[in-house]
Amino acid sequence: MQWLHTLPPPLQDEVAALISAVPQAAPTLDKLFEYASNSPQKQKIPDPPRKKRQQTSAPPQLPPPLTQADIIFHLSNISCQSPFRKRLGFAFHLALGPQGPVPALSLVNNQLQPEFSLMNLGQDIVFCSLLPILGNSTVSSKKDTVLLLVWLAHGDPIVCQLNFDAVKKQLVAEGKVPASAESELDSESEEDDAEGIRPINEALVDFLVRQFQLCGIRLLNYLPFSTGSKNKLTLNKDTALALSTNGTSVNDVVIVQAYRGSKDGALVLLGGTQDQPGTIIFGFRKPILLFRANSVKRISYSNITRLTFNVSVTVHNDTRPDGEETIEFSMLDQAYFQILDDFVKRQGINDDSFNEALREKQKADPNVKAETDAEDAEAPDSDDEEEDGTYQAGVESDSDNEKKEEDGEENSEDEDSEDGEESEDSEDGELSEDGESDDLSLS
């Protein structure tokens, strides 16, 4: 039984126990082993099939680099958040169209190879603006880092953060801005602690607006200025800001922190111009919703408490059976209710807050709940950002407030002061060393 040692140890023990109990079985086991070893019909367990390696597709072939002769205007190494989250160049350049050279817009790498291009600017671009960033506008070292938003007719928008200090250095190095311009403009400014961007950066904004105009694109400027009589902040908090483009008390821009589902973002309301209707934008790390004010059928307020309120916006949507869609934003700070409501009224949007039939319809509408649930279940981004925290605190109802006031009115003043401090101190937002936010693109 020399073959016994070739068996696995547990099987050796079993065979040895069998032979010990039935010694006459040993010859039979020898014959069985010999037959199994030499028989051509022996059974072998096939090896499991190897998984075929997934052949990774080759990276897409990039177009040839742009030549300096083709470039109209180029901002290098800016922080893009959409459609790619990486540092790229933002370039207007000439491209060959059916009827000859036409202006095009591309996001390019360091070798000036386009990684994303728009060849028909008039049809591809819906809306283009410069916007302040919540949390940056209240900090002097960060207020000159702003948002460049290019909303497209199809696909994700182009979202870039512009650090005007970096833009200034590039343009000075290229000889497009005099090296003495900064000191000359700063000396003319009388306000050292102004809330708006620095005078040199105001000049850079005007330069950018002209470059966009050369390519047939209107760049709307909603950045607060420190000089002149236009673009003045009327409200500047970490969680909300308001701006008048005419330097009056009438706000043309309102940006407030809001929630959609459990995700917090920024709700941006922009007033209309002579040739463009007002615009409403909302986004988390990047804008995900944009619709014109003239597409809004009505707006309503709900869950109004001492601290917060919700706002529901109903817009035209031909894909829905009833031709409309309602989007709800929640947990807006009650301190900003009047500013937002005044803006809505000036835009001529119908306030339907007291329509009981509408309230019941919203409660029963599965689309509203489905969209909210979808936002709650949204997978985290694949980049290195920290995951958004999920807001878990309950909304305090009016009946709860009344009960608390009856149980202990002596504590109301302390609670009010604490609540106010928490509201103003929240959501400061961390920034990278170059002053650019690694988190929310709008807030």
UniProtKB/Swiss-Prot annotation:
Sorted UniProt keywords: Chaperone, Chromosome, DNA-binding, Nucleus, Transcription, Transcription regulation
Highest taxon of the lineage: Eukaryota
Region annotation (Disordered) maps to 38-64, 358-443
What the entry lists under SMART domains is as follows: Rtt106
Primary location group:
nucleus
Q: Provide ranges: composition bias, Acidic residues.
A: 373-389, 407-443
Q: Work out whether the entry's keyword set contains Phosphoprotein.
A: no
Q: Where is the composition biased (Basic and acidic residues)?
A: 358-372
Return any one Pfam family short name: PH_18
Q: What does this protein do?
A: Histones H3 and H4 chaperone involved in the nucleosome formation and heterochromatin silencing. Required for the deposition of H3K56ac-carrying H3-H4 complex onto newly-replicated DNA. Plays a role in the transcriptional regulation of the cell-cycle dependent histone genes by creating a repressive structure at the core histone gene promoter.
| Quaternary structure and interacting proteins, as annotated | Interacts with histones H3 and H4.
Q: Which family does it belong to?
A: Belongs to the RTT106 family.
* This protein's name: Histone chaperone RTT106
Q: Which organism is it from?
A: Meyerozyma guilliermondii (strain ATCC 6260 / CBS 566 / DSM 6381 / JCM 1539 / NBRC 10279 / NRRL Y-324)
